[in-house]
Each structure stands twice: as structure tokens, then as C-alpha cells.
Amino acid sequence: ALIQVCDPKRPCTFLHGRRGHLRFEFRVMPEDSMEDFKNDDYIWNLLSPWIKRDNAVLERAAVYKFHACIAENWRDKNVLIAGDAAHQMPPFMGAGMGAGIRDVANLAWKIHLLFQNKASHTILNTYMHERFNHAKWTIAQTISIGEIIEGFCAAAEGKEYNPKSRGYAAQFPHISEGIYKNSNNGINGYPIPQPVSYTHLRAHETIAN
């Protein structure tokens, strides 16, 4: 679960990982000193509403800046970029790694065909065409969620805040460029349909569990 804590004093994001790991992200406030975040006592004080020294181990603490950006070109001859090299996004959706995996999944089978001499090098041109809009859309959604979080924090302080985006779309855009562009099949380039199962869950939710 990815949980956004809209505390105007210090917004926080935390999520559950594998094997009992928890990841917390706190906003660095203007009054903070970077030296504070090198102090374990300071870190434990931030974590104290959720976990304590006697029931957790602090494995790592780091300060970083996040960005919302996307490269204009993902290929130069035999060099292709993917993941954070191609696009960077705020952490509000936890979607950065997923976007990178989609990049590589798109590339892997195309490179495999190239090595088998079953496709020409031009197939690599479809990589950016198919992934660019998805990555750009995901970045826009993470920005939207960030604006919503800012709005909740501002409202908690009694301030008026009107984010440009009031929500975010639940469905990824379909692939409109690349290999499927000239296909006459009406379903090509769209996500796999998710029928309702007997448990009243979507198929991908049942499979994931």
C-alpha cells in the first residue's frame, strides 16, 4: 500500500515493501538543515508516529530531489535509454520503476528479433513511439496527485489552494504509434480487457493475489 500523509507541517509518503520493509519519504522543509538528516536521532523522531527503535531497524536514510522530466530522444544509433535515463517522475504514484520495466519489456523482444535476423533495425524506432506518451502521461498523473496532496495540506492550514488537476485518470492511454499504428484490428494497442470474475474482482487483481 502507498499512503500519503497530508500533514501541512511535513507531508509524508510511506509504503510497504517485501519482507517487512517500510519506506518513508518526508519533505525537507525550509527550516531544516541537511546535517539533521545525517543524525539517526533526528530520523527516528520523524518516524516515531509509526515505528520505534524497539520494533524496527533503520537501514538507510538519504536526501534527494525528485524531478518531472522526459528525454526528447531515446535512441541514437545503437544506444537506447530506458528508465530514469529516459524519464523521471515524482514519487507520489510509486510508478518510476514500473515505467522503467515497461520500457525494457518493450525493448527486449524487439532486440531478440534483431539478433535472430527476424526484424530490421527500424523496429527499434517503434520503442520510443510506443513508450513516450505512456511515460509522459504517467508523469502528468504523478504531478496531479502531488497537487492534490498540496491542496489537502493547504486546506488543513486553512489556506485556499486550487490545483490545476482535480484528479487523475484510472486507465493508461492506448498505443497509437509504433507497430500497431497501421493495424486494422480495433483492439490492438489497447490494454487487455479486465472482466469481472466470480469474486467481483478484476482479473489482474485475482491473478496478482
Where are these regions (language model features)?
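Conserved FAD-binding catalytic core of PHBH/FMO-like flavoproteins
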Residues: 1-66, 72
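Helical substrate-recognition/capping region of FAD-dependent monooxygenase/halogenase enzymes
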Residues: 45, 113-202, 208-209
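Alpha-helical hinge/cap motifs
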Residues: 100, 204-205
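Charged catalytic carboxylate motif
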Residues: 42, 103, 199
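Histidine-centered active-site/metal-ligand motif
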Residues: 23, 67, 87, 200, ...
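Short C-terminal domain-edge/linker segments immediately following a structured domain
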Residues: 16-18, 55-57, 90, 111-112, ...
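Conserved mid-domain beta->alpha element of the FAD-binding
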Residues: 58, 64-144
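Hydrophobic residues in alpha-helical membrane-spanning segments
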Residues: 50, 91-92, 174, 194
